[in-house]
Amino acid sequence: LPWINPSPNMRNLTQAILYPGIGLLEMTHLSVGRGTDTPFEIFGAPYINHLELAEELNRLNYPGVRFVPIQFKPTSSKFVGETCNGVNIILTDRENCPVVNLGIAIAHTLNRLYAPNFDIQNFNRLLKHPEAIKELERGQSWERITASWQSEIEDFHIRRKPFLIYK
């Protein structure tokens, strides 16, 4: 099937896969790559040390991704014309990369390294989970936060099963 953009800023499958996790970061003081050729595959801000961030994120050994330090200048959206320091997310295994949890892991790392510039409170504008924000502010691990949702996710999968039309 030919690719049809589901959104003007979602131009390929990688961006569509990463969007549910990286899109959560949009309301913070961070560019998610809008105004570049690779929205949702990159993110950054002028206040970030891109080398440090890539090293810290790669240290997570998160499944299905690796992070490459980059600098970019968005032509629209946040930080127009400013040099943003950040990372390029290389999707290595889309089948085994829980992207919403990836967004939480990235937010945890950004908050640890760059609070208050990162603005964790605005992360909740899309996450809509105030308890998770409190846990992130307290420095709770992202693994523990996302694990606390597991039973609710399993319940949802059971409830939705009768409505799935494709396997």
Range-by-range predicted roles:
Residues L1-I22:
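Conserved anion/nucleotide-ligand pocket segment
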Residues S7-L13, G35, E56-L60:
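A generic short-segment signal for beta-strand/edge and adjacent turn/coil regions
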Residues S7-M10, P39-F40, G64, I133, ...:
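Generic secondary-structure boundary/loop-capping signal
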Residues L18-P46, G86-I90:
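C-terminal accessory domains and tails appended to enzymatic cores
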Residues T28-H29, T36, Q71, S76, ...:
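Solvent-exposed, flexible loop/coil residues
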Residues G44-S148:
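Conserved functional hotspot residues or short segments at active or partner-binding sites
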Residues D155-K167:
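Structural signal for terminal/edge beta-strands and the immediately following C-terminal loop/tail
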